[in-house]
Regions:
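Predominantly a Rossmann-like dinucleotide-binding segment in NAD(P)-dependent oxidoreductases
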Residues: 1-122, 221, 256
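C-terminal helical cap and adjacent loop that interface with cofactors, partners, or active-site loops
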Residues: 131-279
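A short glycine-threonine-serine/GTX helix/turn-capping micro-motif
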Residues: 37-43, 124, 204-212
Length: 279
């Protein structure tokens, strides 16, 4: 729909991602909670979202201005412990996680704690948590498109909302990954024309992981002669640019200033996204 010009030229994008109190909290139990290990969720998690944005917009990110804070996890808890198995507050902690109910995790993680000290059921309220749990950014692309992005890590549901604003209309989607409101087997797009009626478009769920993307990715890698009509095959450059948006966001928060992607590495943002299929 976007490439077909249904909403004209894209001028801006609204993109908001929600991690629920299970998936989102899990990053604060594990090594991801330390910015020196994960680079923060700007890099470890949001880079996947920026990769999507770069592909959808078909241009390279040029500059980033960001805000972020730690409002819910870490030091904000009223009680804490080293990990859930040793915690005296399990009866009143809504984030209590009983790893002993998962034998695979007991064998993989708990049995090896004596070697590396890694706690898979770490407390989400540990004082050493130093990553953000609330983030927002304004991203400007080389072709002039502006993006308003946010990531919340303690939402009651999982999924994302996205809207593309164009010169001829608007395309919206609400992808409910934890399906809190219905039992339907499809995602729905809504196409608004500036001077016309709205259209509802149903997209059936994919049968493999990540919305059906896992099967497509494996086919691209392992099956010879697979075509790539939508230019979904990503290069090292694509991966670097996705990470660089997160790094720029982190630097922007630290300095209080917008950060240009070109100032971070030798990669120069292009108005038209480069397509490099290397298999």
């Amino acid at each position: 729909l976007r490439r077909a010009g249904e909403i004209g030229d894209i001028t801006s994008v609204d993109f908001h991602w929600y991690l629920d109190t299970s998936h989102g909290a899990d990053y604060f139990r594990r090594w991801h909670r330390l910015v020196e290990c994960s680079g923060s969720l700007w890099v470890h998690k949001a880079s996947h979202h920026f990769d999507l944005l770069n592909w959808w917009i078909d241009s390279d990110p040029e500059s980033v201005y960001a805000l972020g804070s730690l409002d819910h996890y870490g030091k904000n808890g009223t009680f804490r412990a080293e990990n859930c198995r040793t915690c005296p507050h399990t009866s009143k902690c809504k984030f209590y996680y009983d790893i002993t109910r998962n034998q695979n995790y007991m064998d993989l993680y708990v049995a090896n704690e004596k070697y590396d000290g890694y706690l898979r059921d770490g407390c989400v309220f540990k004082n050493d948590v130093n990553i953000f749990d609330k983030m927002a950014a304004t991203i400007r692309y080389k072709n002039g498109v502006q993006v308003a992005y946010s990531l919340t890590t303690y939402s009651p549901y999982e999924g994302y909302r996205i809207a593309f604003n164009g010169t001829k209309g608007r395309l919206e989607a609400w992808i409910q990954e934890s399906r809190p409101t219905s039992d339907v087997n499809f995602d729905e797009l809504v196409l608004f024309k500036n001077f016309g009626k709205r259209e509802y478009i149903q997209i059936p769920f994919g049968t493999s992981g990540h919305g059906g993307g896992d099967a497509l990715l494996k086919d691209q890698i392992f099956l010879p002669g697979i075509k790539d009509p939508y230019k979904q095959c990503a290069s090292v450059r694509d991966g670097a640019l996705a990470c660089l948006v997160g790094i720029a966001a982190r630097n922007s928060i630290a300095t209080g200033q917008p950060v240009k992607i070109a100032d971070l590495t030798s990669i120069q943002p292009q108005e038209k996204k480069l397509y490099q299929r290397i298999l």
